[in-house]
Amino acid sequence: MLIPQINKFTRNIYITNAYFLPDLGIVQALIAARQRGVDVQIMFPEISDNIVVDWIARGIATDLLPGGVRILQYCGTMLHSKTMTIDSEWSTVGSANLDGRSLTANYEINATIIDAAFARQMEAIYLNDRAQSREAAVDKWVRRNPLQRAAELSLRPLRGLF
């Protein structure tokens, strides 16, 4: 459902996700969208209620940043949103995180809304949350603590369990 939408649109993709653990297909689609000139921004919590998920998400961000995808870590209170808007036209919101279990095994559901007015409202919320976020800079990201980066890489194979 998501990859065709990511591949179809041309201007922007704004994702907010509490537990950002996408599979390789979604990661590749997001990087390809950025390479086509799409403004791809992903927001997830700086700190969530699951430290293992936080570490895995940062490891995935390490793959996305060099491809030009903007990573924002939300610094406000608890972020539990699961939204995506594309090109001020297409939106999804619901209970499903971008992780394998939410998309295939858990009893999660998202609504897809194709409505420009709704998408603009979703984008306004995203931009408000973005103001409370810290954007990851590629040069600083790659210079993070080597032990932290090693831990993120070693936990990556576990992303399908969450």
Annotated model-derived regions:
Residues Q5-I6:
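Structural alpha-helical scaffold elements that stabilize or flank donor/cofactor-binding regions
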Residues M1-L2:
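A short, well-structured juxtamembrane/interface segment
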Residues F9-I15, Y19-F162:
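PLD/PLD-like phosphodiesterase catalytic module centered on the HKD motif
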